[in-house]
């Protein structure tokens, strides 16, 4: 199925919160993929930077409760939001200062902007049926993914088990991985 069958204008770059609403409005996997390709082709950097912030498990903001906007503000620029998120990631903004800053951003942003875009980034859930796998498969801009390598069952490779070998039992359980910066 081509992107044109979904009436997607490839020359028009949408605002990120409108893209999220478009993605959540349809359950069609093919349409979601077409939308991701359209935005990738349009090089919608703001959209993919926000998606990266939301879907990258290595990026944490240290915020538990993010308010929902109930009134329109004058609008919040992406640059201002990204600046504050950077401070949250580095833990330069914590406690009451963090809460007050997030509340201030919520008041300044439009309801659409905040509830459908910025808030979803902070809670790390875009709620539109798109995962990092979809983004990475259909976009030139990738979201970092970390997956733990699992052990293979040797029963599938019995012919390779010749000569002297060192064998350890395959155990199921919790893996602990430490990342030192």
Which sequence ranges carry the predicted segments?
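N-terminal nucleic-acid-engaging modules of covalent nucleotidyltransferase systems
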Residues: 1-181
């Amino acid at each position: 199925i081509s992107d044109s069958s979904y009436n997607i204008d490839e020359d028009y770059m949408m605002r990120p919160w409108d893209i999220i609403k478009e993605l959540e409005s349809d359950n069609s996997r093919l349409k979601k993929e077409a939308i991701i390709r359209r935005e990738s082709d349009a090089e919608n950097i703001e959209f993919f930077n926000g998606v990266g912030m939301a879907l990258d498990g290595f990026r944490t903001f240290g915020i538990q409760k993010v308010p929902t906007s109930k009134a329109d503000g004058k609008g919040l620029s992406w640059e201002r939001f990204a600046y504050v998120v950077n401070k949250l990631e580095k833990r330069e903004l914590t406690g009451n200062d963090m809460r007050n800053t997030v509340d201030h951003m919520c008041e300044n942003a439009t309801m659409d902007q905040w509830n459908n875009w910025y808030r979803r980034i902070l809670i790390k859930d875009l709620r539109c049926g798109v995962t990092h796998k979809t983004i990475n498969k259909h976009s030139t801009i990738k979201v970092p993914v970390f997956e733990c390598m699992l052990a293979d069952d040797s029963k599938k490779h019995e012919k390779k088990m010749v000569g002297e070998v060192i064998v350890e039992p395959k155990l199921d359980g919790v893996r602990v991985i430490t990342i030192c910066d």
